Amino acid sequence: MAPSFDHLPDPEEDEYDEEELDISDLRERFEVQLEQGLDTFVVIDGLPEVNEDTKPKLIKFLLRKLDSVGQTKKDSIHMPIGPDGKSHKFAFVEYSSPVEAIAACKALDGVPLDKKHTLRVNKLTDIDRYGREGRIDENYTPPKIEEFTEKEHLRSWLADPAGRGRDQFVMYKDDRVQVLWNNEKDAPESIVDRQHWTESFVQWSPQGTFLTSMHQQGVQLWGGPSWTRQKRFAHPFVNLVDFSPGEKYLTTWSNRPITIGEEGHPALSIDDDGKNYVIWDIETGLPLRSFANLDLPSNSVDADGNPIKRKIQWPAFKWSSDDKYVARLTQGSSISVYELPKMNLLDKTSIKIDGVMDFDWAPATPHREGVKTYEQLFCYWTPEIGSNPAKVGLMSIPSKEVVRTLNLFSVTDAKLHWQSDASYLCVKVDRHSKSKKSLATSLEIFRVKEKGVPVEVVDSIKDTVINFAWEPKGDRFVIITTAEVVAATAVPPKTSVSFYCPEKVKGNGVGNFKHIRTYDKKNSNAIYWSPKGRFVIVATVHSQQSFDMEFYDMDFEGEKPESDKDLTANLQLMNTADHYGVTDIDWDPTGRFVATSASIWKHTMENGYHLYDFKGEQLREEPVEKFKQWLWRPRPPTLLSKEEQKQIRKNLREYSKVFDQEDADRGASADLAVVEHRRRLLDEWLAWRANMEEDVKADREDAGLPLDPLEPLKSKMASGDEGQAIEIEEIVEEIVEETEEIIS
């Protein structure tokens, strides 16, 4: 039976000592940890000057911004007032936690309060850390000026020490990176060989000045004769890098947003926290601006109905040819153009283009007929929206003038292809039939430099174009078409390769584009033009079934077919080759040599490289274990004027005689060296044999044996009957008849 209330002990009569009770374990478990120190305080600078009467209004206005990142109140804002009754233009603010104080520094620093005042927000502990007594020396100490040391010439490689005008290339295999001279048929000459030089891949800058190495901490640029580090850009976990055409600026991207800890960052600031892209000034090594990823729209969903994220578009920031502008596409709405080096938005606003799908800068400054001021140019395209047709446009920057537009109908997709001199723009338009069951391709070619930018249409193509490539510095192009739907299958679809060029016209004009020839029943999927034009390789890459390469000459010097008399080309297949498992094909910058390679990044079978000349003759083949990359070193644009280049072309035959003689002399000297080496080896062997014979003779004399080892045999043969016949029997079996009997 439970005790009644009357039987319970009276707590007032119960005698005990509170100090004897041990509740330390409960206190340790449940005690609320109060924030210590000044971590919850921030200092706000840049406030307007107020007096005691207007101070409450400013605090009330300020609270609206402060409450957007954390919890604070009117009593937590302390705004000192001076003896003259006016504020000191700063205030102390207390938040409820250090996390909110850090968030306030990130979100409110640099935010405009009004047109004349911009907030500067810092943690109070930072001010104490960097500004307390002893941190700054009161006495001025002049900086120590280091002794001048001359920097290395970053383009010294252009003066080949061998005097042969050789090109360099970088090869990445296993964990080693090598830079080498190309020696054609002979083994390449190593310049530098380093282990663990990069963590993912290497990349040349557009003019070959720098070699880029990728690291978890960021990007490093190397160059000069001694291959020392020239620059470093601290972007943690960087994945990709892109240079401006003139090597003035650099874009780095990481799929991980940047995180700036309390200890800070050597190059980036709190403003860069949470960003993925950083645009750098290469000369100073400083960041110009950072950007976050954009959420790319996607029309496809997974099995659970969630939208599938699209792959990142690279490069996301595209450079103008003169390095003065960089632009970014917000797909479906706008193009943002930024002025360099300040990275301010052009005219402080993005260019609104409804539905815009893609854009691309002209690779050179186009000199358009009838235009006095030459500006940069970019093209863009928009799909059909409602009853509005698809559209291709050309816009001039910085004026933002729309130079030319073209309406298109029944468009499924479009691709933009600039010619290297910006003389032409080809828009490859995939159109669907009314039933939307079949596709066909037309080529809309904008003649950019001609007055009014006329458009020529090549619509005689019945199949779908899967590849298109302009001739560099020329006006001819190659396309690859297929009648089948291209899918990721082991057996590639049958394709056709077609060549086009302008027809001849009087004067300096360029005629209409005409079809030269088509080669059917191919497996080709890639086009590689020589950087100097004229020669082109049509190949099959990334295939498990076919590895063909065909070398074509567009200006063959032989007899021209009658059907091509009115065309500006004489097409000839020079050679064919194959490289098992080929994944990459690279022309050297002079157009003399071609390297084909099979990278372990794609497959592990027969990795290595082949080297060909421009005619398709194989010069060298080298299997390389764990081969990853081969990249020719680019060359900067020539410093010769057009007149000087014309003079060189005029005397090219005379120069060729000198070069041919040098090649012959070098080949003869190489042959002579081989002969001398073999003769030296033979002389060494004959001398060794003579010494050994002397030693054997001495040993036989000491052993009492005849000097000639064959002397006993000769004596025995001499003592026998010379005329005695020797009978030799040989048994030969011959099959006379053969029968076959089946036994059941």
From Swiss-Prot:
InterPro entries: EIF3B, eIF3B_RRM, Nucleotide-bd_a/b_plait_sf, RBD_domain_sf, RRM_dom, TIF_beta_prop-like, WD40/YVTN_repeat-like_dom_sf. GO terms for cellular component: cytoplasmic stress granule; eukaryotic 43S preinitiation complex; eukaryotic 48S preinitiation complex; eukaryotic translation initiation factor 3 complex, eIF3e; eukaryotic translation initiation factor 3 complex, eIF3m; multi-eIF complex. It is found in: Cytoplasm. WD repeats lie at residues 193-232, 234-290, 307-348, 577-622. PANTHER family: EUKARYOTIC TRANSLATION INITIATION FACTOR 3 EIF3 -RELATED, EUKARYOTIC TRANSLATION INITIATION FACTOR 3 SUBUNIT B. The gene is prt1. It comes from Botryotinia fuckeliana (strain B05.10) (Noble rot fungus). One of its GO terms (biological process) is formation of cytoplasmic translation initiation complex. The keyword Zinc does not apply. This is Eukaryotic translation initiation factor 3 subunit B. Residues 1-21 are annotated as: Disordered. Its main location: cytoplasm.
